[in-house]
Amino acid sequence: MCDVVLGSQWGDEGKGKLVDILCDDIDVCARCAGGNNAGHTIVVDGKKFDFHMLPSGLVNPKCQNLVGSGVVIHVPSFFEELKNIEEKGLHCRDRLKVSSRAHLVFDFHQRTDKLKEAELSENKKSIGTTGKGIGPTYSTKASRSGIRVHHLVNSNPEAWNEFKTRYMRLVESRQKRYGEFDYDYEAELAKYEKYREELRPFVVDSVEFMHEAIAQKKKILVEGANALMLDIDFGTYPYVTSSSTGIGGVLTGLGIPPKTIRNIYGVVKAYTTRVGEGPFPTEQLNSVGETLQDVGAEYGVTTGRKRRCGWLDLVVLKYSTLINGYTSLNITKLDVLDKFKEIQVGIAYKLNGKELKSFPEDLIDLGNVEVVYKTLPGWEQDITKIKKYEDLPENAKNYLKYIEDFLGVPIQWVGTGPARDSMLEKKI
């Protein structure tokens, strides 16, 4: 059976830490969507490992790891990330697999990603993309002109010529759209001729791989990327990523049926953050937001950008819970709220004086909502040294209980600091 870890807000909730803890007792860790446009750090024996595209299960020497079909892969970044991990003493090549059906991100995807963003910026409609080429790659995938891993690694004598033909079609279509931009496609092709040999040992039929693991009753953990509010269908479109970041993306990205899913863990930051552009109803453009940013060290692992900060938004979380069906929650960074005398929580939206029954799909409406807040008392004490849930201050437990009751989902873990052991488990 499969357990799944998903982000419930706009990303950066701290999924990696929970995955790291759960990885101690699993046989397979799989990534199902996204690319190297997100990241997190795991500390093992004092060494920091930065993960962007590769599964976090690589830190467990007994765990097999899969980059699934729904992931888009920039091969140079794949090997760079692998090299950085190996240089710190983590030998994992024999435990890392790549789906033959995953699509490839090329350098020209990244160039056109930045050109597109520059165009949008001129019209003040910037998305806030990471510039990693993720959107353009999913675009070519959807238009059925993309290039998949099997196109690159196929050992048939005719395969390399077919790969070059597909590649040049993509380059030419970008040149028609953006003109002759500074890009050496011949040099990139030469690199990929070498990569095809280097990548081939990692490549598997991921459907066969996953279903063999399921049949053998292996313990499988699926590591979600980004978060529900960045989902291409259910997020704050168009300020979203280009893949399905919810539970649906797990099934389509790995080729597994719903009946194989056992637990769905929703990771929730104790307040709300967002990187880049897009609506953010509970954002605090004041000293509250600055405090959350400073105390929470809210800077992106991948981009280094400051994260926008605000109060916890239970309207967002209720919507996220409806779609993903969380079986339990991990509340992270509760300690960041330690110094607040009072803590506010968004519990409803009003538009033109009327309370909305559901999360608005239209950004004009979302930008004009009035947030209804519930004010809860803070605990005003350091909780970072606490090792048992029962020892948390009463007001901290009341804050968590309010979240549980509002969402109808039990909280199973509470993060009280950055260290791996700063995670309290609560009986459910």
Curated annotation (Swiss-Prot):
Its main location: cytoplasm. InterPro entries: Adenylosuccin_syn_GTP-bd, Adenylosuccin_syn_Lys_AS, Adenylosuccinate_synth_dom1, Adenylosuccinate_synth_dom2, Adenylosuccinate_synth_dom3, Adenylosuccinate_synthetase, P-loop_NTPase. The active site is at D12, H40. Pfam families: Adenylsucc_synt. The keyword Metal-binding applies. SUPFAM superfamilies: P-loop containing nucleoside triphosphate hydrolases (SSF52540). It is an enzyme of class 6 (ligase). Pathway: Purine metabolism; AMP biosynthesis via de novo pathway; AMP from IMP: step 1/2. It is found in: Cytoplasm. GTP binds at residues 11-17, 39-41, 307, 333-335, 415-417. Substrate binds at V301, T302, T303, G304, R305, K306, R307. Its EC number is 6.3.4.4. GO terms for biological process: 'de novo' AMP biosynthetic process; IMP metabolic process. One of its GO terms (molecular function) is adenylosuccinate synthase activity. Keywords: Cytoplasm, GTP-binding, Ligase, Magnesium, Metal-binding, Nucleotide-binding, Purine biosynthesis. Plays an important role in the de novo pathway and in the salvage pathway of purine nucleotide biosynthesis. Catalyzes the first committed step in the biosynthesis of AMP from IMP. HAMAP family: Adenylosucc_synth. Belongs to the adenylosuccinate synthetase family. This is Adenylosuccinate synthetase. It comes from Lodderomyces elongisporus (strain ATCC 11503 / CBS 2605 / JCM 1781 / NBRC 1676 / NRRL YB-4239) (Yeast). The lineage of its organism: Eukaryota, Fungi, Dikarya, Ascomycota, Saccharomycotina.
